[in-house]
Amino acid sequence: MKNLITLLIILVFSSVYSQSTYLHCGQLFDSKKAKFFGPHTIVIDGEKITSVAKGYVNPKSENDIFIDLKSKTVYPGFIDMHVHIETQVPQSIIQLSQSKTADIAFTSSVYARKTLMAGFTTIRDLGGVGVNISLRDAINEGKVIGPRIFTAGNILSSTGGHGDFTNGTKKESYGILGPKDGIVDSPDDARKAVRQRYKNGADWIKITATGGVLDISKSDANPQFTNEEIYTITKTASDYGLKVAAHAHGDEGMYRAVANGVKTIEHGTLIKERTMDLMISKKAYLVPTISAGKFVAKMAETPNFFHPLIEEKARKIGPQIQNTFNRAYKYGVPILFGTDSGVSPHGENAKEFIYMNEAGMPINESLHIATFENAKILDMENSLGQI
């Protein structure tokens, strides 16, 4: 992956100088067609590509910038559809909730830069304490260097569910949580929680439809929302122009999510054919996150790294995710590219290409997904994901 040269380098140059920038590319990846083409010239004015031509076109002015990439392959900036930019390799969800907001703000800016320099110019952040929204705005305003961020803010969970950050803590530590905190136990709670996230500035809504690995509880795959709650979440989100993503390992919670309008399923570990059929018919997407599965399985072998409850779940769930992707891909389930970086280290996002290839997907197809298809689900295909 060392020879993958993305446009992030070019945009840095272009933002500093007012001249045109000419790139002579040895190969160019057409993300829409999922094909590689020979020598091309890319011309950039300011922060926008204004021309893409076959062969090598020389600069028109001596003031123009020339960058020789004849020995390189040039891609659009990659898009990661599952990132947690506020944290890295947590031992449990509790860690983030117990961290100081200021500390999270500083470290998340470091993770953002790592992600950008790894070639990922856009990410979808799927949950934190809310710093992710401020980080998105700071990057958009040019105050911080990092990728373009679409974020869910903080996630929605049922009481005691995977996203309930009070699991494993003293009851008196946090008091009674409700929709504002992301805790949903009724359709009315669901409606309020979505509206609160819209008010906070979220771009997406994220729910934990089933149990998970990194919370201190026994549940790893049980359904954690009712059909009525999920329907209310997706309907309210749609009213405000938002789509919904669902963390899900168990099939029942997954099925409920897709049946009630969730657009992307994260992980999908124990998916059954009935849910794959439903995803195909409703054009819902699987975001595999093989990187996270491999990483938690690896860390489960490190003595005392995880709480015993988490370690047991990591050993069970982690090793299955790559095979799940293989089954879903062969079955014809729509796939997006996402790593769950934050659970795994930031800056290593591109390892997912290798893992997807190991599980049967050709590299050019995963590159197509990480650019063109990911841009489409973000409704940004006219400005992102292709050169």
Where are these regions (language model features)?
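Histidine-rich, glycine-flanked metal-binding segment
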Residues: 28, 32-75
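His/Asp/Glu-enriched, well-ordered alpha-helical/loop segment
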Residues: 239-243, 308-309, 316-387
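Histidine/acidic-residue-rich catalytic or RNA/ligand-binding cores of hydrolases
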Residues: 89-93, 161-162, 215-216, 254-260, ...
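Active-site gating loops and adjacent loop-to-helix segments of metal-dependent hydrolytic enzymes
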Residues: 87-103, 113, 159-178, 213-226, ...
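Metal-associated gating/positioning segment near the N- to mid-region
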Residues: 72-141, 159-166, 228, 252, ...
